Amino acid sequence: DLTEACGEKGQKTIVQGKSHVNFVESAGKLYFATHIGYYSIIDGMEKMGLPPEGWKPYPGGHLLAYDLKTGKFEDLGLAPDREGILTCNLDTQRGRLFGLTWPSGIFFRFELATRNLKSFGKRCADGEDGKGASYRTVCRSIAVDPGSGSAWFTTSEGAILRYRSDTDAVEPVVGEDMKKDYFGLYDPTSAGHMAYNW
């Protein structure tokens, strides 16, 4: 029960409905994150679930560690702005988790040793919470280079963004993108496809 693992059982908040991420093992623990599993259809689109009467809003996705020996969960922290965590990955060399939230596409970095979370803000216009020109599909994967500590993800317009561990900053990759003829042509402001995200 993910809601119980997050310490929210009996709190009558919208539950932790699923995990949408790859699980990564490091030092005998599996690291992963939770995501909302209860949605409301608003203007024909899935949005954060509106709580039924007597219930509280979704508290946000949790970063969790599962100890493979003891079978115990450890709650590491919450996603920025009470959003779900759509994807995450771990730099096992430096103990840094990287994530993207849903629906807004906030990119963040979390230090396991200090439990310091740094938000780099929305990286996908207004993400899947946007309407019209501000709508963008949020990337579903983050690649990590254990040698450099860099993390990469994409935008639906095809930009490749890189987190640099040496500067603790996010920057666009210059001179390369995901907008290739063989991927087809996409309107990044329309729903129903991943656009130029990998």
Regions found by a protein language model. Name each.
Residues 67-71, 111-115, 164-168:
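Short loop/turn segments that connect beta-strands within beta-propeller blades
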Residues 14-22, 83-89, 129-143, 182-188, ...:
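Repeated scaffold domains used in trafficking and secretory/extracellular systems
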Residues 1-6, 74-78, 118-125, 171-185:
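Beta-propeller fold detector
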Residues 36-38, 103, 157:
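Residue-level signature of beta-propeller blades and closely related beta-rich strand-turn architectures
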Residues 61-64, 106-108, 159-161:
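A short loop-to-beta-strand structural motif that recurs across blades of beta-propeller domains
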Residues 25-27, 91-94, 144-148:
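Residue-level detector of Asp-centered blade-edge/turn motifs that repeat once per structural unit
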Residues 33-58:
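Short, conserved, GDST-rich strand-edge loop motifs in beta-rich repeat architectures
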Residues 30-32, 96-99, 150-153:
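Conserved beta-propeller blade signature
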